[in-house]
Amino acid sequence: MIEEIDNINKILKEDLLTTIQKGSKISIAASCFSIYAYQELKKVLEEIDELRFIFTSPTFIVEKADKEKREFYIPRLNRERSLIGTEFEIKLRNELTQKAIAKECADWIRHKVQFKSNCTNQNMVGFGVVDNTVYTPLNDFTIVDLGIEKGNNAYTKIYKLGLPFSTSNL
């Protein structure tokens, strides 16, 4: 089974709400994680067994770079700040619910989530796996990639693949 998700005719959030089940095991590789994406999927994410998340670029790691190289680490800081919302989620940050969402998300993370970071200089393509279903490519875990807000991309093409394609991404 191969389906195309364009976030116009078929929205990733809606598809995930039907794909994620109680006891699901999820793996995500993406450049950033947003508490607002968690909020949109909270109902189903609270019921999963586990989520393994890997940042596709070095994020939340201790710097060991020379002083001359540090000036080029601004994108990493932006990825880390995206935890509390990207530039497209400003409207949500202004609703004064950020503290409550962050607390709920932190509690959920403590019980069900493992975070890791790609600490190499090698590129990783983002994807998401829910049990036996893979979504690829997946750039970020934000409301833009979920199809709730419009981002800077001219178009979105996420492919939903079932068995046997999904097992190679675990």
Regions found by a protein language model. Give the residues of each.
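PLD/PLD-like phosphodiesterase catalytic module centered on the HKD motif
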Residues: 1-170
